[in-house]
Amino acid sequence: MDIFLAGPAAQLLARNPPHLLAGNRSLCCSFPQRRGGRAALLAVLLCLCGLMLAPASQALHQPLWELGIGVGALSTPPYRGSDSRVNYIVPFPYFIYRGSFLRVDREGGIRGKLFSGDDISFDLSLAANVPVRNEDDGARRGMDDLDPLIELGTELSIDLWRSQDRDQRFGLDIPLRAVYSVGNPLLEYQGLTLSPFLNYRIWQEDEGALMRYSVSAGPIFATSRYHDYFYEVDSRFVTPERPEYHADSGYSGSRVTISVTRHFSKYLIGAFARYDDLNGAVFEDSPLVETSDYFVVGLVFGWILGESSTMVQH
């Protein structure tokens, strides 16, 4: 669930839970659920796999830093398990830094490298969720709004396979983070999350543009305190349709994410789609869970205003 220091939003959206951007609710989208949703996801995956069959390039070099501005759009449920949707359009500053220790990029958000070897790395990482505002007719009607969350922790990345030119990678990434709400009190501990995922990436050059394709999938686990933050029904908020509920620790569902980014000399475009499945989650029987699967989609466009003359190997 990586969030960027200053906004490469396509990968921010693609790797994180669906509460990542705040802004004007100005889009209008609807998406198929259950069998229809899974069939649509399969079709998108097949299209992306077709793109991935194109030949990959040699080792790539990119500027040490890039600076610009962009705009992102996101359509998502307000929280995992809600059957309503919120739609955001958000401007953001765009900053990428590809240093040997500190990296801010589309691959993994903000990362401070604690250790890096040929096939394994251990990084510091940061994530965030925007607040959840309750609607008049939703499952959380009459309940308190939820403060935004920040997540601080580490991520272990293991390369299971890389191509000879290092422009394709299949690996296992294991983020473990402590979660804190930001509000009143200023910071309050809200549990732990663990979300290991398998990831396949391709980088290639195409007519002067750098293309990046990614497919990832994996489960999510969290403590009862984290689950209660979203799915608990305290005795104060019990109604005939909404019984008291307290969540357990354990399995939080699974997700499949695909993303494509095209990086030109002065601008970039990107898109992602994620399918989230809550079947079997320990909080699935919460009265606040209205659907057990859904889609999240996002788009991003960025303008690069300046970049370093120093090039580093990608």
Where are these regions (language model features)?
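N-terminal signal peptide c-region/cleavage motif recognized by signal peptidases
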Residues: 49, 54-56
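Short loop/turn motifs that connect adjacent beta-strands in outer-membrane beta-barrel proteins
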Residues: 59-65, 80-81, 100-121, 161-170, ...
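Residues that define the transmembrane beta-barrel architecture of outer-membrane proteins
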Residues: 65, 85-91, 118, 146-152, ...
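Residues on the lipid-exposed face of transmembrane beta-strands in outer-membrane beta-barrel proteins
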Residues: 71-75, 91-97, 108-114, 152-158, ...
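Sequence/structural signature of outer-membrane beta-barrel proteins
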Residues: 74-80, 129-135, 159-163, 177-185, ...
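Outer-membrane beta-barrel translocator domains and adjoining extracellular loop/strand segments
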Residues: 80-85, 135-140, 183-190, 225-234, ...
